[in-house]
């Protein structure tokens, strides 16, 4: 079995598999595509949906101290002025004078193993020309509301979901009667006009965030910061991500955002190297105090036990759903020798697998199909299923392995003529067991639980 530390060439295999099997398609492909923009296909939409549901379950449903929110993508421009995004949500842009390609200066420095640009001459990676001096480029997309395109109608597409939580802090307190410490979670689209998007779905201009703002008493923030770092790392491990492919990296002081007291990234070893998967930040009381000052609305929390008003400090775990889906896809990918061929398997955790169980009649013989469809109808009410009767049973097993289906249920001639039982095949071991059709749902549930599922 090969290592899952994929080489650069193997990323091509991931992208090819993603398109061929319906995980991710290039967007607008019939018109030549549009850079770093992707559409999720039938399996990809299920994978990302399962990732989001796993996150929501762990953050909201299984906790008493976190509630949900879904705020608007377009908000008052004053929100982004108060938050600092209008003035400071920028990246350093450099341009090649000959080929006119644009790059992020900090990314070029990082590739050189440097952290500061002083005294460094940056050259174009393509033609070697000396790049321009960096200028700051605001990443927010502008648009206009209403029929008149003037300054009064200008708005921005949100670059993060967090601010929608902060401006609703008091609304949530009043509606839910929550007491500090508590959190507000949100999943939604955000938009950043990235200078150099890339690495497939890792960095795109339109992406989906899963963010939670956890409000704590000042002075207790360090303990909660440590708690959420450990909790979020464990979430990935619980979904089957290999421990050696994960690490924590604390930001150095010069890396910290203007609002942050501390920040730590959960990094994943992607084919191109270590990159941020999730960030956990101590945002202090910056956001609530800034919005109170700008809006004139009181956003301090009244602590009844202390008889004191204060702005809570905020611990923020922020994860991109697209990055999470990519990491899980890469981590699941395995190539195993199988005689003279290579067996490609996606060893997804069963709770995020797009299909949990496939029902496969041994052939398309008319006598098998009604029973196979009956078994499928019973299973699809309880699990994510797929019915497949095209091509040989061996090819169908391979196809299900390649999309990450944990279990396959095969209906054969003995099922209809002899024992009224089916064969259940395990993706990881390829072991097969015979189970009466009356017990197939329980057997599938037991099989999925044996692979780590919580069904």
Predicted regions: what they are:
Residues 1-455:
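NTP/phosphate- and nucleic-acid-binding module
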